[in-house]
Amino acid sequence: VRAWGWWVLQQARKELAPFYPTYADYEPLDKKSNVHYEPREPRLVPLNDDGTPNIDALNADLDQSYINDRAKPRWIAKPTVAYLWARTVKCKNCRATIPLLKTRWLCKKSNRRVLLSMEPNAHKTGVVFDVQNYVPIVGGNAAQRREQDKRMGEGTMSRSGVKCPCCGTIMTMEDLRVEGKADRLGMAMTAVVVDGPKTKEFRDPVSNECAKSEEAAQMLAELFEVIPFGLPTEPLPSKEALGFRVPLYGLDQWQKLFTPLQMLALGNVVKHTRAVKTVIEQNGYSKEWVESITAMLAISVDKLADRQSA
């Protein structure tokens, strides 16, 4: 199952690679290095034929002795792990776009604290996000630190409703439900999770990544034409169903729980999970083995759909 699951992943990754671009940072492998270097803007990493990033193309002008010195900077590929999104709504007073965030903490550990800062843009039509790494701990004792962290990471949502960061107007939860049922909720990319040399890292999204999401939305109809039953437009359980409150906000179809990129990724995995059955049969597996492997892979897709939603 693991081997054929890897086959599905490789096939899907090849098709999805253009929609999940890998960027490289110019830095040394040894973060404690004292070697001075000029920072550079991140660069898009070209792809190999199999969809994997070709970081060697960016470092082609460096000799092997330079590469072997971990203290010297070079281009380091940081593949995208996940895009973080926030649903948005228009302020009923100033019409600015409000991101719906309960907290702005991206990571809050004793040795690693990452905060998503949020400021009104120049025209106050929305906000500008910025990922802040290495946020210091403030406060003399545990209670003070908790209170300070709460204030620093305060989002736009609370029990009373949604506060506009541009004009301060409070939109009640009923206002939010009205906007949702009128199909006026949007989405905005807030941050990108990447796979660094040692651990997961966070960075700001680039314009190319936001454009890829729009491109993905245009490809969904064609992709799901080859998948039985097409796009998951089936209705969600009613608001009376236990644990299902999203229909109150206009999310009344299964497909509305996913961003276009998430739906594109899920569709590609489904397509190749269906195709793997033929490949397994061609490799001489018995009928029982074919059915067992494909059933386990289908269960894995179900788990993926459960975890990969907005």
Predicted regions and their residues:
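Charged, often flexible domain-edge or linker segments that flank or initiate folded functional domains
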Residues: 1-310
